[in-house]
Amino acid sequence: MVDYYEVLGVQRHASPEDIKKAYRKLALKWHPDKNPENKEEAERKFKQVAEAYEVLSDAKKRDIYDKYGKEGLNGGGGGGSHFDSPFEFGFTFRNPDDVFREFFGGRDPFSFEFFEDPFEDFFGNRRGPRGSRSRGTGSFFSAFSGFPSFGSGFSSFDTGFTSFGSLGHGGLTSFSSTSFGGGGMGNFKSISTSTKMVNGRKITTKRIVENGQERVEVEEDGQLKSLTINGKEQLLRLDNK
């Protein structure tokens, strides 16, 4: 029988943040697209990790799992007659890809996966570039999106710039972030740029958030390869080479 705590590599008393952090790390590690040479095992692991996160990230499901195991979620145990399970007819797990997309908010996590450890090493714990602890999923996306985790850091007028050189992780060569804007509902603009080498090619990802609109540009060796606005990929007109 699979132990969901073992799948995520966390203790039974793990906090919700611990569970989110574990899922993020393992989902990126075992995503089938990142393991083409070992796709069958990756798909199995990816599915297990998604199932474990789905159960342990939900207080009600986690409580039932702690008491009755996976059987409780399936409405088992003699037809559920000896306990009151809200999943009497069985709990249906979602598609692991849907869990993955929802967790990362529809963004491409692979272009930012190097945020996980280097920042933790620099600050001793998970902190945003301005030193304020990121909230939400615990990923760094919230720190650059102009949503709640950044909001509390702004006074009537605030500017910020952060830049890192090579961190020796995942081929990262540089990362920079600038942000400025007025207080309250005034204009806000955040720009973050990351550059890394992948198979000898220079991949630059630029994320611009302004007045609630998010624009993500990905360039390969200086040539624009993809453009996403508010999570929707735009068609590129390749008039030039």
From Swiss-Prot:
The keyword Cell inner membrane does not apply. SUPFAM superfamilies: Chaperone J-domain. It holds the Pfam family DnaJ. It is found in: Cytoplasm, Perinuclear region; Nucleus; Cytoplasm, Myofibril, Sarcomere, Z line. Residues 2-146 are annotated as: Interaction with HSP70. One of its GO terms (biological process) is chaperone-mediated protein folding. Residues 3-69 form the J domain. Homooligomer. Interacts with BAG3, HSPB8 and STUB1. Interacts with ALKBH1. Interacts with HSP70, KRT18 and PTTG. This is DnaJ homolog subfamily B member 6.
